[in-house]
Amino acid sequence: MSAEVHRDRWGIPHLRADSALALARAQGRNAATDRAWQIETERHRAQGTSAAFLGPEAVGWDRFARRARLADTARRCYAQLDADTAEWVGAYTEGVNAGLAESAGDAAEFAATGLEPGSWQPWTPLAVWLSTHILFAQFPAKLWREEVAAALGDRAVDLFAADGPHTAGSNGWLVTGERTASGAPILAGDPHRFIEAPGVYQQVHLACPEFDVAGLAVPGIPGVAHFGHASTVAWSITNAMADYQDLYRERLRRTGAGVEAFGPDGWEPATSHTETIEVAGGEPVTVEVTETARGPVVVGGPDAPSAISLRYPPRVTGELGFDAMASLLRARTVDDVDRALDRWAEPVNVVQAADTRGGLLHRVAGAVPVRDRANGLRAVPAWETRYAWRS
């Protein structure tokens, strides 16, 4: 299987191959060629190993990534992919590894930090995706409200229950053909992201006998997930700002058999093990990784005065939405986009799409659990059935 790469006068890569798998390998190789330092940094962040070359300032994130079980969750989600999607993602990582071996040495950052490019596993893109989006929902705000309650009292929490009067965020525009001079619909996506160098997106054109798509790819992730144009249909997203992660106040204790957590039915086993974070220019840091029936403990622990666990959909369901990414590339109409997004999970997005037949789509895509309204404000008691997810 062969592939070819052409760069236009703006340096945008146009990749063409004789099969979808060969194209995935070419896209992975191109990501490694153009963004080697970026994707390797994201891999280490997802695995909780970035302090090994970034130093003590990265320990905080590495500790969270390990305690939240980001890499382990990615492995679970990869194991549940359908066979075709798993092969597609695997082909992409093969390309990444080939590209890193060929050209990563050209990136000055590797020489400056002494970092040697590592090996991507088939599940690594899922870990990078999860790590990139784990803070997109509301659990950081819930942690903030816990701090408010501790400092100012429970009555002050309602003062921080909503955003302020100023608006912010991405926007998307979807105009029916009935309101345009051409009679065709207009779609415009306007993502508002932090200014980063390199940017969070990479313009790319992907073509093979099965599809022909141009758009914005996320380096380290196969396909064109967020903003794409596939000849007869186009799609774009904004963050839905949905609340789909919950925090639980846990009661933990050590026993001769390990760690237990107090749940709705009393004391129950929790898993616990230790991991070591290597730190450039510092001493190694030992982290205890504990998980209850609600989710991984991300604040406190068995020996701390309190503990808080994080429950997030991919950890519960083993679904991250990569099956949707492969289907999006093959979309021809807004109905195809709609069906593909039924498999979307993380993060929760607002999606707009339009096609050349005049079709329009505006929907929310992603996994949002059904639970008590109180879960949306702050951490809730793990031992009360009322706060359990109902679906």
How should each PLM-predicted stretch be described?
Residues P219, E346-S391:
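Hydrophobic alpha-helical segments
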Residues S2-A197, P209, G215-L216, I221-V224, ...:
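Substrate-recognition/specificity elements adjacent to catalytic centers across diverse enzyme folds
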Residues D82, G95, A168-L174, C208-H226, ...:
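Short alpha-helical segments and helix-capping/turn motifs at coil-helix boundaries
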Residues G153, D212-E283, M325-R330:
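Compact, glycine/acidic-enriched structural inserts
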Residues D84, G321-R343:
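Alpha/propeptide regions of enzymes that mature by internal proteolysis
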Residues N97-G105, R330, D342-E346:
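Sec-exported extracytoplasmic/periplasmic mature domains
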Residues G169, A217-V218, D303-S309, V316-M325:
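Flexible glycine/proline-enriched surface loops and loop-helix/loop-strand junctions
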Residues R16, L23-A26, G183-A184, I195-G199, ...:
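Short helix/loop capping segments that flank catalytic or ligand/cofactor-binding pockets
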